[in-house]
Amino acid sequence: MAKKIVGFIKLQVPAGKANPSPPIGPALGQRGLNIMEFCKAFNAQTQSVEPGLPLPVVITAFADKSFTFIIKTPPAITLIKKAIKLDKGSARPHTDKVGKITRAQLEEIAKTKMKDLTAADLDAAVRTIAGSARSMGVNVEGV
C-alpha cells in the first residue's frame, strides 16, 4: 500500500550547503521530518554541482515521518547571471540594460533547463529563457 502524503515542501537550497538553520530546519521541523537526514542526503546528491548554486528542491512528506525529495535544475535567472557574469538584474529592466546574451548562450541554458520547462522543443525553450533575460534587463541577441 502506498504511503499517505501529508504535504509538499518547496525550498531553494544552495548546492552542497544544506544545514539545519532556516529555511530548512523550520520547514522540515513543522512536518516532524528528520532534518539532518535530509541535509546529509541533499549534500551527498549535490556534490557534483557547483557549490553554492541555488537548487530548487521539492520534498514530499509522508504520514510516517519519512520523505523523498526531487532536486530540480537551477533557476533560469541564476543561469543567465552566471552566463553573462552579472551580479544582479536591472532595477528598471525595460529602460536600463545591464548586459547582452547571445543565442548560443540561451541555447546552452535552455538545454540545461529543458527537463523542468514545459516547452515542446529547444526553440520554444530558448524563447522562454529569452523572456526571462529581458525581464531582468538583459539585451537578447539573435532571437
Swiss-Prot record:
GO cellular component assignments: cytosolic large ribosomal subunit
GO BP term (any one): translation
Gene Ontology molecular function, alphabetical: large ribosomal subunit rRNA binding; structural constituent of ribosome
InterPro entries in UniProt: Ribosomal_uL11, Ribosomal_uL11_bac-typ, Ribosomal_uL11_C, Ribosomal_uL11_C_sf, Ribosomal_uL11_CS, Ribosomal_uL11_N, Ribosomal_uL11_N_sf
Keywords: Methylation, Ribonucleoprotein, Ribosomal protein, RNA-binding, rRNA-binding
Any matching Pfam family: Ribosomal_L11_N
Highest taxon in the source lineage: Bacteria
Record-annotated disulphide pairs: none
Maturation and modification: One or more lysine residues are methylated.
Keyword Nucleotide-binding: no
Function, in words: Forms part of the ribosomal stalk which helps the ribosome interact with GTP-bound translation factors.
Complexes and interactors: Part of the ribosomal stalk of the 50S ribosomal subunit. Interacts with L10 and the large rRNA to form the base of the stalk. L10 forms an elongated spine to which L12 dimers bind in a sequential fashion forming a multimeric L10(L12)X complex.
Annotated family: Belongs to the universal ribosomal protein uL11 family.
Protein name: Large ribosomal subunit protein uL11
Organism: Variovorax paradoxus (strain S110)
UniProt gene name: rplK
